[in-house]
Amino acid sequence: LWQPKAKDMNVFKNLTFKDDFIVGNNNIGYDRWFASKKNFQKSNEYCTVRKIIKRYYKKFKNFSFFQNFKNRLEIKKQKRIIQQNIQDLFEFPSKCFDDVLEKKDFLLVGHFAYFDKGVCRYISNATQGKSVLVVSTTPWLKKEFVQNKLKIPSIIVPKATFNRGYDGNVDLNLTESEKYILERNPRLKEISLRMKLQYKDMGKNYPDKMVVFLFQYFDILLKKTSPKKVFIWNKFNATHEIFYLVCLKSNIQCIFMEFGVIPGTFNFDLQGQMGESWIANHTSDFNKLEIDLGELENAKKVLEYICKEKLCRNLQPRNNLIDDIKRKIKKDRPTIVYFGQNDFEAGMIPYNQHVVKYHSPWSIDSNDACRVLSEICIKNDWNFIYKPHPNLEWLEEKKSEIIDARGVDIHELIDLADVAVTILSQSSYEALMRGKPVVMLGYTHLKHKNCTYEAFAKDDVEQILDKAIKDGFTEEMRKNFHSHIARLLKYYLYDDYVARKFKYGKKIEDFQNEFLN
C-alpha cells in the first residue's frame, strides 16, 4: 500500500468495508489514503515514464551522435584511401600492366563488349588467325567476360570516360610533370574540358589527371605491343580520342569503326568519322565512283526492305506517345521535326575551329540549334517538335511552343513530319529513306550529295526551311539519294552478318583484304 499502482487503487476504490474480507469501521481512514495517493500516483507515474523516456532518448542520442561521428570518420578515412589509391594509379601507369604483353599486328580499341549489337562476332570472325589484342575500354567488365565474348586476347583499361568507368566526386592533386604534359598538349586540355562538361560528378583536377594518365598508359601499351594498325570504335569518345593522339605521336595508322549510316552495316574509314570521313571531305571524288543499273536497283530494294521491316540502329520504344503529339500539333500548319545528337560523342564539344570546319559551322550544340529553329517556327506559326538525344539534357528554358518528343518512336515522328532537321544525327538517313525532305545544319556523309537541303549558315536557315516545306523531297533528290546509297553499299559499307532475310553491303572477306593484309 505504500507504492500502489493505479490499477490496484481502482480495485480498492470500488470496494466498501462491508464487503467480504474487509472488517472494522476504519472506512474514513481508507478514503483519506485513497485521496492522498490518487493525484500523487498519477503525477508520479507520469514523471517516472517521462524520466525513463528521457533517459533512454539521451542514451540513444549519444549513441546516435557517436555512431554518426564514427561513420563520418570512417567515410573520410575510406575517401582518403580511395583518393590516395587513384592518385597512385594515375601517377604510375606502368604498374597497371600485370600481363606480359607481346607484340601484336593489330589492336582493336573500344567498348563493344558492353553493347555488342553484332560487333563482337564480326570482329572475332574477321580476325581469326591474326595477331590481335583487344583493348577494352570497359573497366566495369571482367577480363574473362570480354575474352569469352570476343574469343580474342584482351586487356581492360583501368579507367575510361563512360559511366561506371571513372570515380565520381574524388578530388585529386596535379603534379608538376602532369601540368607540363597538359601545357605541351593543347588537345589533351580540350578533351579534359569536354570530360568536365559531360561528367558533372568528376572531382577537382580529376579530368586533367585522367587524360594525362590515359595518354601515358596508351603510350606504354603501344610501345609494348608495336602494332601495325589500330582499329578505334567511335573516335569521338574522350578515351578513344586520347588513344588516337598517342597513335599520331607514334606514327601508327588508325582505322575508325562505327555502325554504318544504314541499319545492318558497319563502316571503316582511314580519315575519320562523319564530317571528318573521306566521303564528307572528298565529295566530288565519291560522287564520281561508278555504279551500274543493277547496283542502283539493289540500293532501292535495300531501302524498301529497311523501311518495311522498320530496321533501326537502336531499338525503338513501343508506346502511344505519338498520339499525344498528334493532339498538340495544328493540323493546318507545316510540322518541323528536329533531331538532336549526342554532342559529346559526335565531335561537337568543346566548340572550336575544328568543329566549325568538320562538324557544325554555326550551332554550338543541339539545344543551341533548337532555340534558333523554335524562334523561326513560332514566327511562321509552324509546328515544332524536338527529339533530343536520350543521353542529353532537355532545354533549360521550356517554351510551350516546343513539343517534347522524348521517348517517341523515330519512325512515327518522321511520318508525322513535313520536314526533318538535324545537325549530325543519323535520323537524316531514316527520314530520306521514308521520302521526307531533310535540312542539314552540319556536316556528315550527306554533305554535298545533292539529296538534302543544306543550311550551313545561320542566316539561311529560315529561307531554306521554307523552301523545304514548299518543294519537299524532289524527284532529283530521290535519284541522288538512291545513287548515294548504291555507292555506299558498293564501296564503303560492310554487311554486319546479323541474321536477316535480305543481305547487303561488302563481305567480310573484303574487310580482311582491305584492312588486315
Short names for language-model regions:
Residues 2-55:
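Glycosyltransferase-associated regions of secretory-pathway enzymes
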Residues 277-324, 451-517:
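Leloir-type glycosyltransferase catalytic cores
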Residues 193-195, 366-405:
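Catalytic donor nucleotide-activated moiety binding site of glycosyltransferases and closely related
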Residues 110-111, 137, 159, 259, ...:
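Short loop/turn segments at strand-loop or loop-helix junctions that form parts
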Residues 232-235, 239, 407-454:
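A donor-sugar binding/catalytic signature common to diverse glycosyltransferases
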